[in-house]
């Protein structure tokens, strides 16, 4: 199967969730430009149309902040994107609480919950923790760590985060928040959408 990839100049992958109108085109190979670039399209009656503002797909339409919701600025190749990270922390009287993550690495979630417990004293041991990236996007970068932690704490304490706050940053095993690449680009994208505060 890889023989064909070596014969062509460009390899593109279409990605989408079942039932979604949106499609992501991901460049796996491009002899004439950058690889790993993303294009966002919407399927309409006239065919595919480019989504000019992809961040709008992944942001909530709510007017008020709710507990467990945080806006993350993630970097997909050369494109910064605003996505909503949601967490639900719910008491589980059983012996084995669940840890589920959609759009994020489940093992990373377990690690972040351990860091929260060790360095901030917030124990979620007797709780189920569910984390989701809204819109079906998969976020692989560690810059999502801080957003996951804040969303989980926000849900657990039933306190909403400010609506004009964006978050990004890697959380280390010793509890520190580490800087991530493309900080200026992330902040510029957030400012375009009216976000005034950041935690990074």
Q: Language-model features: where?
A:
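Peripheral, non-AAA+ core regions of ATP-driven protein-machinery
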Residues: 1-200
């Amino acid at each position: 199967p890889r023989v064909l990839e070596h014969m062509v100049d460009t390899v593109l992958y279409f990605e989408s969730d079942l039932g979604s109108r949106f499609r992501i085109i991901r460049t796996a190979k491009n002899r004439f430009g950058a690889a790993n670039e993303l294009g966002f399209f919407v399927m309409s009656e006239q065919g595919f149309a480019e989504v000019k503002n992809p961040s709008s797909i992944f942001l909530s339409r709510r007017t008020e902040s709710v507990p467990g919701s945080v806006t993350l600025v993630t970097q997909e190749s050369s494109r910064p994107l605003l996505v909503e990270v949601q967490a639900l922390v719910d008491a589980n009287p059983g012996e084995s609480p669940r840890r589920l993550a959609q759009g994020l690495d489940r093992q990373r979630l377990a690690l972040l919950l351990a860091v929260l417990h060790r360095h901030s004293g917030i124990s979620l041991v007797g709780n189920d923790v569910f984390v989701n990236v809204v819109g079906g996007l998969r976020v692989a970068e560690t810059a999502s760590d801080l957003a996951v932690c804040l969303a989980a704490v926000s849900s657990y304490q039933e306190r909403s985060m400010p609506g004009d706050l964006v978050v990004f940053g890697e959380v280390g095993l010793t509890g520190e928040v580490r800087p991530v690449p493309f900080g200026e680009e992330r902040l510029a994208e957030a400012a375009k959408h009216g976000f005034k505060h950041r935690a990074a």
